[in-house]
Structure formats: structure tokens, C-alpha cells
Swiss-Prot record:
Signal peptide bounds: none
Designated gene of the protein: lpxC
GO CC term (a single one): membrane
Protein name: UDP-3-O-acyl-N-acetylglucosamine deacetylase
Phylogenetic classification of the source organism: Bacteria, Pseudomonadati, Pseudomonadota, Gammaproteobacteria, Moraxellales
InterPro entries (alphabetical): Ribosomal_Su5_D2-typ_SF (IPR020568), UDP-acyl_GlcNac_deAcase (IPR004463), UDP-acyl_GlcNac_deAcase_C (IPR011334), UDP-acyl_N-AcGlcN_deAcase_N (IPR015870)
Protein task: Catalyzes the hydrolysis of UDP-3-O-myristoyl-N-acetylglucosamine to form UDP-3-O-myristoylglucosamine and acetate, the committed step in lipid A biosynthesis.
Top-level EC class as recorded in UniProt: hydrolase
Pfam families noted in UniProt: LpxC
Reactions accelerated catalytically: a UDP-3-O-[(3R)-3-hydroxyacyl]-N-acetyl-alpha-D-glucosamine + H2O = a UDP-3-O-[(3R)-3-hydroxyacyl]-alpha-D-glucosamine + acetate
Organism whose genome encodes this protein: Acinetobacter baumannii (strain SDF)
Amino acid sequence: MVKQRTLNRVVKASGIGLHSGQKVMINFIPHTVDGGIVFRRIDLDPPVDIPANALLIQEAFMCSNLVTGDIKVGTIEHVMSAIASLGIDNLIVEVSASEVPIMDGSAGPFIYLLMQGGLREQDAPKKFIKILKPVEALIDDKKAIFSPHNGFQLNFTIDFDHPAFAKEYQSATIDFSTETFVYEVSEARTFGFMKDLDYLKANNLALGASLDNAIGVDDTGVVNEEGLRFADEFVRHKILDAVGDLYLLGHQIIAKFDGYKSGHALNNQLLRNVQSDPSNYEIVTFDDEKDCPIPYVSVT
């Protein structure tokens, strides 16, 4: 049987908040069977839990925020993608502020931290959401589409008319697994345009942004001295974001995802469209690991 997963032990770390510029503590804590992924604001008294649920998402300034009442946890997509890549079903993510630390702008540091905690199987079947028919979300010329597929394939295309974005590196496809995500996607960093930075900081946003946690793009190209980690790092990061956004459906998805200029808001609308009609999907489990179409790292 393919079983649910959590961590073996607590892992603690800290980093800088992208928008606040302040130090943020983050703790990963094992959670119970069917507990799901839960973000906990430990800077509040009493602490407030917010489940990682697509219906609680609000987009703000190019990131995904979980919101309940007037309480939020922002910039969750990178850590969610790391959690998804390791097949973790149940986890409490404690943060000491209203946002997850940005780390280096990729999912790599979060995968490293989670692996330090060790993976532990739980005595319950892992649930998957299998898409049964095409579902789409459209905004202007932007598209996000699910279609039936035996696995989880992500196809993404961006469209930037800019010297830093070579046309031949604006599309990418991956067949999702722990291995492909870790080696081909997880290290791809978020990116932003230098011309926007002054405006954001003047509005008390992106106060923690730097070339240590993002790819900076000016009018002519990439500002970072080390350049890009991959020739197509920009579109790989959009795939990274999509993996995190789509895991907010509550379970790993079995489908093909096609994104064209899609972002957090459109990814979330796609999930809401899936949920709006129960005939769009079914919950499945696998009695034999050989039948599971998504390969995860082994639990040792």
C-alpha cells in the first residue's frame, strides 16, 4: 500500500521575510494521519492554525497567501512545492510572522530541511486526486488547464519580450517525481524586475528582497553576478510555483497541467473550478506501489 507520510522529527530554521525584511523562524512538525498541511502562526497568542486549502488563498503581490479572518501566512508556494515533492501528506509548519522566509528564492533549502527531519510512513493509505475530464481556467490570454493523465505532467510557457528571456527557453515540461523535481526544478529561483523594486520598497513591500534570494532583471539582462542556474531558470521557477499552488487541493494530483502565462491567481482559480463539480475528479489510493504513477523518494 502507498501510505501517507509525515516527518520523523521536528526541524527548525530561520530566514528573512521577503516583504518584511525581518527574521522569521520556521519549524516543521510531524502531524497526525489525515491532518493535512497546516500553517501555524506562533507569533500570535493564542497561536492560529490555517490549513493549506485552496479556498483560503488570496493572491497578493505575486505570491500565494493563506488567509482566515484578518490572519494570514504569505509566500507559501515554495515550501508547499518542497512538501509536495517529498510526498508529505501531514505536516505542521510553524512560522513566527505573517510570511514564510524566502530563503534563497527557491525550494531547495526547504527540501534540505525536510530531509533532515526524515520521512516516516503512517498507517493509512495516501490519497490522490485523479482528474477525470478537462478543466480549465482562463483570464485574458492566460490559461491553466488540467486534463486526464496517468501521472503528473507539467507543461509551462511564459512569454516575455525582453533580452533576458531567450525565446527558446520560455517553455518547459517535467514528469513530476521526487527526483525530477529535486534535480530539475527545486533550485530555480524567483525573479523580479529591478525597475519595480523601488516602488515596492516605498510601499513597505519586498523589504527583504536581494540578489541573494531572487534573480534581478534590469533593462538589458540578469543582474546577478553568478548568472542563471539553468538556461531556462525562469520557466522552471514557474513550474516550481505551480507545484506548490496545486498541492493546495489537499492531495497529490494525477493529471496533466498546461500553463500559459499562468500565475498564482489563475492556478488557484483552476483548483476552485475542479472543486466546483465533483464529477471532475475522484479520490484514489493504491494497494501496490508499482501501480502508483508518481515516483517518490523512498522512506528509509
